[in-house]
Amino acid sequence: MSRRGTAEKKKIAKSDPIYRNRVVNMLVNRIMKHGKKSLAYLIIYRAMKRIQQKTKTNPLSVLREAIRRVTPNLAVKARRVSGSTHQVPIEIESTQGKELAIRWLLAASRKRPGRNMAFKLSSELVDAAKGSGDAIRKKEETHRMAEANRTFAHFR
C-alpha cells in the first residue's frame, strides 16, 4: 500500500547463464550463503549434471516437476481473534507457492545425509519429482493443517 502514487511492480527474476531459466536463478539465490553466488551456481550445476546422469532425462524437466509437486495451494496463517489465536487457511499465489516449494526443497536437501550439497540436492529433486521425499511430506502436512482448520476460513 503505497502512500505516494502507485506502488512499484515487483522485479521479475533474472535467468541464469547456462539454462536460461528463472526458476534455476531463484534456486541459486536461495542456496547462496554470504554472497557466494559462484559457489551456489557450482552446486546447482553439479546437481543438474548428477540428475542428468541418474535419470537420463532433461534435468530442467525434473526440476520443474519437483517444484510443481511440492508447490502448496493452501497454507495456514495465525490470526488473533478475540483473545485466541486461530490458524486460518489461506490460498497461496503461484509465485509465493513456488518460493515456498524452493525453500522446502532446499531445507529437505540440507537435512539429508550425504557427501555434499550437490549430491543431496539432486537426490531430493529426483525424489520430489517421483512424489516422495521430505519436501513432499512438508507440503502434505501444510495441506492437512489447512484442512483441519477449515472451520476458521471465515476469519480471512
Swiss-Prot record:
Keywords attached to this entry: Chloroplast, Plastid, Ribonucleoprotein, Ribosomal protein, RNA-binding, rRNA-binding
Broad class of the protein's primary localization: plastid
GO cellular component terms attached to this protein's record: chloroplast; small ribosomal subunit
GO MF term list: rRNA binding; structural constituent of ribosome
InterPro entries to which the protein is assigned, alphabetical: Ribosomal_uS7, Ribosomal_uS7_bac/org-type, Ribosomal_uS7_CS, Ribosomal_uS7_dom, Ribosomal_uS7_dom_sf
Membrane spanning residue stretches: none
Signal peptide (residue range): none
Protein family: Belongs to the universal ribosomal protein uS7 family.
Subunit comment: Part of the 30S ribosomal subunit.
Designated name of the protein: Small ribosomal subunit protein uS7c
Native source species: Pisum sativum
Record gene name: rps7
